[in-house]
Amino acid sequence: MKVWDMHCDTLAELRYAQQAGKPKSFLHNDLMLDLERMKQGDYLLQCMACFVHLEPEREKSPLLACLEEIDIFYRLLEQYPDDLMQVRTAADIQTLLTSGKRGMMLTVEEGGACLDSLGALRDLYRLGVRMMTLTWNFKNGLAEPNIVPGTDDMWPRPANTTGGLTEKGLEFVEEMQRLHMLVDVSHLSDAGIWDILR
C-alpha cells in the first residue's frame, strides 16, 4: 500500500540544524523523515511543511524563514532527482504513479508567514505551495488557533471554540480557492472551521 503523508516538519528541522552549524542529510537522519524511510515505507507522496514561528524571539521574519525552507525543498529535489519529484497538480500524481519516484508537495504551516499579504500568498503559490494552514498555535491576522491563547502553562489546554476567521482570513480563503490551494484546517479553531464551511 502506498503512503501519502499529509505533514512533516522535516524542512524546518533541516533549517534549524543548518542554522546551528550541524547540517543533516535528507538521505538518512534522526528527524521525522528521510529518503531511506520514504523508500522503505513505500511512500507515494509526502507533504513537506514550511513551519515558522510568529514569535519575534524565534524568527527574525516568518516570511524569510518560510522562503529559506522553500529553498531547502528545492535543493532536495536537485540533490535527489532520481528519487524525488515535486507534485503541484493532480496530473503530477498520475505521472508519479508510474515514475518510481517519491513525490513531495510543498505546504505552509502558519499562514502568518504571509504577513497578511495576498501578494505573498500568491508568490508562495508561484513557488509551488499547494496547501496552507491559516494559523498554528498563535492568533494572527487571519484566524485564531484551536487553543485558547495565553494558556501555555495549562494542561490539557482549553479549546478555543469562539474565535474564528478575520476579514483578511476570509479573503485568504477566497484567494486560496481561486488558486486551487488546499486550506488545511489543522490548528484552526472550531469557529474558524465553521467560517470556512459557510
Language model feature labels by segment:
Residues M1-T162, R198:
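N-terminal hydrophobic targeting/anchoring segments and the immediately downstream early-domain regions
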Residues A159-L197:
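Loop-centered beta-sheet repeat module
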